[in-house]
């Protein structure tokens, strides 16, 4: 049975699974869908065309599904889609998309989003990410699986953050972070491979060593960007006997090759 506090305001058109909990003074809009097992704390607002999956937890005073902070926005029915088992803490803001992009802001599964985080319009967040308190990402940013955002970090619009990358606290990021790389600084720069994080995720020592070598080729060997891409592609081919390592090297190569904003240097 849905447990809705008497002081909460839930629009009659909202679709809530039978076991959803809504705390005191929260507001749920007419175009909201919330899946089984999700809990909404007190004083939280969920509005817009927002679809939320199963077993999510929203703490107090979160603002979810509000209109994008984009001066071109004219009220188009854009969306926010949130997956399963996410934890979204106090005073977090997550906005719907814009028609200038795909029209969808998307949050995957199993993400840990701490207090005062801002996820802007059209952002695409993968699975198992961590957003530390006060991390802020601008519109159209992509955050891939297992990435970690340090507290009080800020990310420029259209930037991509690769799988298993880590952005240090209070950093300002204006270009892409390749997968597996640590970045930090008031103009974020590379600080090596996220070795401890990869070990915790079960990466083999051979794969970690290969990724450190790819990092060296890209950042330490004095090669041009184009020449570094060629050398890393050779490393992919040379690792064909170890498919896991070859796959991770290919991810590293393909990410930097696809960059339009450029990568951190």
From Swiss-Prot:
First-level EC class: transferase
Alphabetical GO biological process terms: lipid A biosynthetic process
InterPro entries assigned to the protein according to its UniProt record, in alphabetical order: Acetyltransf_C, Acetyltransf_C_sf, Hexapep, Lipid_A_LpxA, Trimer_LpxA-like_sf
Major localization listed first in the record, in broad terms: cytoplasm
Pathway: Glycolipid biosynthesis; lipid IV(A) biosynthesis; lipid IV(A) from (3R)-3-hydroxytetradecanoyl-[acyl-carrier-protein] and UDP-N-acetyl-alpha-D-glucosamine: step 1/6
Reactions the enzyme catalyzes: a (3R)-hydroxyacyl-[ACP] + UDP-N-acetyl-alpha-D-glucosamine = a UDP-3-O-[(3R)-3-hydroxyacyl]-N-acetyl-alpha-D-glucosamine + holo-[ACP]
UniProt keyword annotations, A-Z: Acyltransferase, Cytoplasm, Lipid A biosynthesis, Lipid biosynthesis, Lipid metabolism, Repeat, Transferase
Subcellular location: Cytoplasm
EC number, UniProt record: 2.3.1.129
Pfam family for this entry, one: Hexapep
GO cellular component: cytoplasm; membrane
Molecular functions (GO terms): acyl-[acyl-carrier-protein]-UDP-N-acetylglucosamine O-acyltransferase activity
Biological function: Involved in the biosynthesis of lipid A, a phosphorylated glycolipid that anchors the lipopolysaccharide to the outer membrane of the cell.
HAMAP family: LpxA
Family indicated by similarity: Belongs to the transferase hexapeptide repeat family. LpxA subfamily.
NCBIfam families: lipid_A_lpxA (TIGR01852), PRK05289.1 (NF003657)
Subunit details: Homotrimer.
The protein's name: Acyl-[acyl-carrier-protein]--UDP-N-acetylglucosamine O-acyltransferase
């Amino acid at each position: 049975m849905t447990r809705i506090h008497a002081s909460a305001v839930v629009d009659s058109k909202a679709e809530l699974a039978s076991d959803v909990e809504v705390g005191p003074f929260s507001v749920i809009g007419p175009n909201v869908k919330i899946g089984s097992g999700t809990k909404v704390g007190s004083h939280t607002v969920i509005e817009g065309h927002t679809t939320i999956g199963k077993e999510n937890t929203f703490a107090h005073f979160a603002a979810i599904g509000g209109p994008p902070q984009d001066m071109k926005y004219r009220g188009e029915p854009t969306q926010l889609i949130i997956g399963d088992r996410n934890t979204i803490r106090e005073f977090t803001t997550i906005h719907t998309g814009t028609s200038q992009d795909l029209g969808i802001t998307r949050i995957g599964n199993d993400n840990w989003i701490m207090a005062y985080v801002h996820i802007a319009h059209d952002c695409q967040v993968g699975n198992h990410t961590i957003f530390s308190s006060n991390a802020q990402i601008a519109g159209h940013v992509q955050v891939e699986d297992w990435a970690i955002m340090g507290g009080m970090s800020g990310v420029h619009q259209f930037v991509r953050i690769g799988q298993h990358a880590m952005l240090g606290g209070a950093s300002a990021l204006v270009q892409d972070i390749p997968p597996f790389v640590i970045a930090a600084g008031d103009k974020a720069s590379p600080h090596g491979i996220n070795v401890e994080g990869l070990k915790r995720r079960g990466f083999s020592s051979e794969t970690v060593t290969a990724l450190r070598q790819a990092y060296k080729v890209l950042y330490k060997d004095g090669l041009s960007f184009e020449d570094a891409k060629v050398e890393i592609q050779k490393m992919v081919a040379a690792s064909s006997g170890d498919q896991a390592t070859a796959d991770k090297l290919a991810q590293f190569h393909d990410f930097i090759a696809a960059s339009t904003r450029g990568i951190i240097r």
